[in-house]
Amino acid sequence: MTMTIDTICKTLGLSHEGTVSVSRDELASLSLALVEQGASFMFMYATDDRARAGTFTVHAVFSVPRDGFFTLAAALPADRPSYPSLTRTIMAAHWYERLMFDQFGIVAEGHPDWRRLMHHENVPAGTHPLRKDFAWNTRLGEAQEPYPLHEVEGKGVYEIPVGPIHAGVIEPGHFRFSVRGERILSLEGKLFFTHKGVEKLVEGKSPAEALPFVERISGDMAVGHALAYAEAVERATATVTTPRARMLRVVWNELERLSAHVFDLGNMAGNGTGFSFMAAQGFRMLEDLRRLHEELVGHRYLHGAVTLGGAHDIDARGAERIRDVLAKTERELAEILDIAFSTDGLMERFETTGVLSEDAARAYGARGIAARASGLARDARADHPYAAYASLPFLPVVETSGDVAARFKVRARECAQAIELTRQALLALPSGGESVPLRASRGSALGWAESFRGTVIDFVRLDADGRIDRLAVSDPSFMNWPLFAEIGPGNIVPDFPLCNKSLGLSYSGTDL
């Protein structure tokens, strides 16, 4: 008999947003059962529970839109931490399982690709930094471990190595193209040159002490990360924020989205195709928004906009300034988008380039723009409303062609949506306080937010003193970088920068 999500939950005693313990041998089969009945794989993380239970634990998180999050947790023996791989049937798990081996030494048996992920060649074998007995300031020895890149052989096939250092002002990443003529046959990326050790560095810190680390996971996504983290900490401590704080969080989330999308629209059309008019106008409009951010919260990238238990307040003058800048941005954006959409040379570069099919987007667990431009209406604001989104009219923006043009259109439409949501939030802003103190307590919980790149999910566990025992972060870029294996091949080499900019991913957000 085919199991439904309801029957699975009933069988396991699993409640919404709950965690259920399963055996190591059940984890893969139950995970597949959830996916086959409509759940989406979202996140995997591990915890070192040797001190309390003598085990490591692997957690697999799933989402059912408008229903809840489900976590399956499998305890593994400390002397042999292994389990049957999920990747064999759920492709979206493949990077997480490689990452958990690098971090904890946990083996996903049967995984098809056992190369390193986070660790580069100079990290000695047996280095697992998220184990509790590994100190953050451990000095590593010298090593030169192999990291073989895939090779494509055939007549006329050659390789083009790009990076990790690039000509533009971007972060480091290496890409290896296998090419015949100008046509890309295969594309593989090697990232993780920007490792900061955030999840390790926050261990033992208070939630407030950890917040600045979280805000800096990805420089342009301070609100998205801070919001997911704050919601996790607040759930873990049973802290209930005020209605005003929840509505303020909508404002900050949408202002960050608007500024990022304005930048990406200019970057895609300008630096991606040479249509420099769009770059100049997009970057000029971005500067107006950055100056507004600094005027409102004292930081151009909105650090401090989200606080634990609340949000930075907005007075009447600040609200009026936001409305003025939104009106100007809306008017100017409409003008430049009209020019962009009526420029045949630009749209011809966008259309049919970098196509990601709906099936591939679903299989890889795509998030954000990448998912919605390929026909998947995935958006945490609608699927799992947080902050005050449940009280605002909202439907995800979806396109279906899956190409660069679709990703451009989704961003353009989401700019208009962000402007309208911000206006609605300011109009509905309740009176009252903007923050409450955290309740100091031991606990654990998930938190999430829909950043401009996609869904951020955090797991937070606090110890008996209310300090961070484990922070696990799922950044949307981590899920979306593997998409290049799908959108790169079949295109010509000069279109790769355009494909890259159309996804607009973060190197730093991927490499915590």
Where are these regions (language model features)?
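Substrate-recognition/cap regions that form aromatic- and gly/pro-loop-enriched pockets
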Residues: 398-490
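Short histidine-centered catalytic/ligand-binding loop motif
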Residues: 78-91, 218, 397-411
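Intrinsically disordered, low-complexity regulatory segments
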Residues: 278-282, 292-436, 442
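Internal, well-ordered alpha/beta segment that forms a basic, Gly-enriched binding/recognition surface
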Residues: 218-342
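Short coil/turn segments at secondary-structure boundaries
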Residues: 45-47, 266-271, 302-307, 348-352, ...
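Active-site- and interface-proximal helix/loop "cap" or "latch" segments in soluble metabolic
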Residues: 158, 162-267, 271, 294, ...
